Amino acid sequence: MEKDRGEIFRKEIENLLKGKDIPVKTDQLGNYSIRFKSKTGKKVIAIFAHLDEIGGTVRNIKKNGRLEFSRRGGYEGRWLVSRTVEILNKEGDWIKGVIAGRASHSTPEKLRVSEKFDPLEMEIYLGASNKREVLSDYKIHVGAPIVFSGEFGLLNPKVNNNVIAGYSMDNLTALTCLVVLTQKIAKNLLDDFGCIMSSHDVCIVATAREEIGTEGAFFFAKNNQIDEVIGIDIGIVEDISGSVHSGIKLNKGPVIVWQESFGTGVLDYKLCMNLTKVAELNKMPFQNGVFEFYGSDAGKAQKWLGIPSALIGIPTMFSHNVPEISTLTGIESAAELIFQYLKNFE
């Protein structure tokens, strides 16, 4: 879950900053952060990427041993049937389950074309025969967290060393980008004393609870003096007929997001334009995006706290599904764009 992923993030950052007096800090909501201090500290820029992933929570244990669940984060029921999940039991072990659904062999034609799948009506099969087994043998309780099960890595490593696939690309891609960005800063922008050679401080923040309301980013931004936010998240790649999209391509560079959340999340125009100029000056490919069914840490900081905020998306296909598809070059190019912005920020 978030804490385990946060501790992995901590170790990666600490390895990059060995010998530097730059501690990784945590707060009450589970955010992990470091601060690169400048000599003047005129401004503070925070770079956000979230730790959490979509999942669920056990809502009810039925007499027949199946589990009913509620969602964590936004996703649809239509792709859930036969997906493998893992449930954290009270002893800290992960128990595998499969989301149940009617088999094709027993589904009449009229339901095949018209049936809607509501996650609230779906069940998870564990192998238990009754409720007692779930409680005593599997040691699962109401309130237990659920995550989708899967692996991640190169999709076809023998023929393609760029395209990656797996669960939770939202937001493992952005977290990886945050680590790559930290590496670039540590290697190129720090002096012998560990100060960033800039007029501004930079906070690197792995945020908690984004998928359930961008709570971690809001908490961090509200409790720290932040002058500017750049969020890193996925950029929606979509070309299926009937979908709403901005024509983003998987291999055409990072996405500068101008608007999200049905038009209620408008990112800072000046900051977005500045990122555009940085990309153009450095001859870096980039894309422009507007996302409707989508919200982010950056959008929350902009809307609710009035902090000038921008969002960089790493092109990703099949978002909030398992697996999701992204690229290693997408991660690297997003990190490079933000690095060049920080390097030239005034």
What are these regions (language model features)?
Residues M1-E346:
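N-terminal hydrophobic/helix-forming segments and targeting peptides
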